Regions:
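Conserved N-terminal beta1-alpha1 strand-loop-helix module at the mouth
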Residues: 1-88, 94-96, 103-106, 110-111, ...
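Short, hydrophobic beta-strand segments that form beta-sheet elements in well-ordered domains
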Residues: 113-115
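Short acidic loop-to-helix transition motifs that present clustered carboxylates
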Residues: 118-120
Length: 167
């Protein structure tokens, strides 16, 4: 599978958000990555659906919506209404992950799952064949500009092996 570049708009300057989206539109990026944080699952708040609607109007690339929130399943209809191609939820935020993945797929989006640096890749064994993509966090979620956590490279290798073994 060809790697897909999905630049995040988390650090965008909101005064120039349209310019940043236009830059992504003109790039080789495959998607626009949007991080949504609720201040509960992670200790920070990003932006909400009014900003996402604005981004969706401007973006020519598919939206990759990464929910760092509790109960992400409650927002499946809103994420779908934005026209998102991918809805990415955290393993750690979903006690019924398989159900959430099914709901995302039934809504017509590609389900993706994220794991935090401390979460073992083996936790994805039962769900790996049901998701389009896995995001391995290389920092603890909630803040930009953190130092890269070295052992996450090993997690990517473990994930590749899990995908190879399970098909």
């Amino acid at each position: 599978m060809k790697p897909i570049i999905s630049p995040s708009i988390l650090s965008a300057n909101f005064a120039y958000l349209a310019n940043d989206i236009e830059m992504i539109n003109g790039s080789e990026a495959g998607w626009v990555h949007i991080d949504i944080m609720d201040g509960v699952f992670v200790p920070n708040i990003s932006f909400g659906f009014p900003v996402l609607k604005y981004v969706a109007k401007l973006a020519e690339k598919p939206l990759d919506v990464h929910l760092m929130i509790v109960q992400p399943e409650k927002f499946i209809p809103e994420v779908k209404a934005l026209g998102a191609r991918i809805m990415n939820v955290h393993y750690e935020a979903c006690p019924h992950l398989h159900r959430v993945v099914q709901q995302i797929r039934e809504a017509g989006m590609l389900p993706a799952v994220t794991i935090n640096p401390a979460t073992p890749v083996a936790m994805l064994r039962d769900i790996i064949n049901d998701v389009y993509m896995v995001l391995v966090m290389s920092v603890n979620p909630g803040f930009g500009g953190q130092k890269f956590i070295e052992h996450t490279i090993d997690k990517v290798r473990e994930l590749r092996e899990l995908i190879t073994v399970t098909g």
